[in-house]
Swiss-Prot record:
Promotes hydrolysis of glycogen and lipids, and raises the blood sugar level. It is found in: Secreted. It holds the Pfam family Hormone_2. The lineage of its organism: Eukaryota, Metazoa, Chordata, Craniata, Vertebrata. The keyword Signal applies. One of its GO terms (biological process) is response to starvation. This is Glucagon-1. The keyword Nucleotide-binding does not apply. SMART domains: GLUCA. It comes from Oncorhynchus mykiss (Rainbow trout). Keywords: Cleavage on pair of basic residues, Hormone, Secreted, Signal.
Length: 178
């Protein structure tokens, strides 16, 4: 019996050791994982450092490019100012264009009122007697063939307007007569 009790004791001892050994192994496995975590963190840190240095390089390069572009722009401004060529500002051009448009509209209104007043026939008769006079356009240029064509078109338009206005006037007189 002593042999059976010893055998039972040895088996119990082996079972207890296994039971105790498995939590220790799990603890060692956890500790080995914990030790690998800092290693992984170190590796991640190294890759982060690499990324940071790449970002620093690209950031420095971007700053260099911006500074270079600014220097090129300043150099271009200085060169364009030295050339002495007259520069035209957009605001001046817009103002000039607006004034020109206004003057052209005013000239067209004056021309139509001149045609309506009937002075056109009298002046053209005087011109044919005295010879052609050089008239100037609003902007100071001499009258060209295009302006002469436009004048004749305006005269035709005026005559058409006069003819249609007289027709409506005759119809009013006819209605009053009846």
């Amino acid at each position: 019996m002593f042999g059976i009790h010893s055998l039972a004791g040895v088996l119990l001892l082996v079972i207890v050791q296994r039971q105790l050994a498995s939590p220790l192994q799990e603890a060692e496995d956890n500790s080995s994982l914990e030790t690998t975590d800092p290693l992984l963190e170190d590796l991640m840190g190294v890759s982060n450092v690499k990324r940071h240095s790449e970002g620093t390089f690209s950031n420095d390069y971007s700053k260099y490019q911006e500074e270079r572009m600014a220097q090129d722009f300043v150099q271009w401004l200085m060169n364009s100012k030295r050339s002495g060529a007259p520069s035209k500002r957009h605001a001046d051009g817009t103002y000039t264009s607006d004034v020109s448009t206004y003057l052209q509209d005013q000239a067209a209104k004056d021309f139509v009122s001149w045609l309506k007043s009937g002075r056109a026939r009298r002046e053209s008769a005087e011109e044919s007697r005295n010879g052609p006079m050089s008239r100037r356009h609003v902007d100071g240029s001499f009258t060209s063939d295009v302006n002469k064509v436009l004048d004749s078109l305006a005269a035709k338009e005026y005559l058409l307007w006069v003819m249609t206005s007289k027709t409506s006037g005759k119809s009013n007189k006819r209605q009053e007569d009846h």
